[in-house]
Amino acid sequence: LPVSGEIPLPPYFHGELDDPERYQTVFAKTVGSAAAPTAGLHFTPTVVAGLASRGVEIAEVDLEVGLDTFRPMSVDNIEEHHIHRERYEIPQAAAAAVAATRRRRGRVVAVGTTVIRTLETAACGDGLVRAGGGESELFIRPGYQLGVVDAAVTNFHAPRTTLIALVAAMLGSRWREAYAIALERGYRFLSFGDAMFIDQPVNR
């Protein structure tokens, strides 16, 4: 793969990256993902260390982001869309960290839409998650009730994507206001763009 393969960049990228490491997160450890979970690109070793110094515990999960994450929905009725599958692995340490957060009445903050899907797929009641691996085909859209995630960091996404549907599920009608502000202020969208912090989802 390092010799013959190419980085599967999103379709809105043209040409090649000058530095492929720019499309790699500080959390990456194994080969398998077809795309970077781009919300993680906002985190540097300095940012991670700063969070730790403030008492923020970081728990990692293994994600295999699929290429379909970039593809727009081709149906007008969102209920008719068949979402792609993505493989994941939740270590025991991550499941234990979620449980410890619940005991101290803390918040579970997901970094990226794939992490949100993963945690919600592995939900087992009372805001907890099961350790282990599997495939997620969970389609989080308006009306979905979050069972694990209390807040999230995510990029600004393209229209007609399942990523926008997920943001709308978390923010309700406020997502349009948030995106209008982003456009007005010139925030950058997509993989190397800016991020938003969803603090209080409407259904948590």
Where do the protein language model's features map onto the residues?
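Surface-exposed, charge/polar-rich loops and edge strands
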Residues: L1-R204
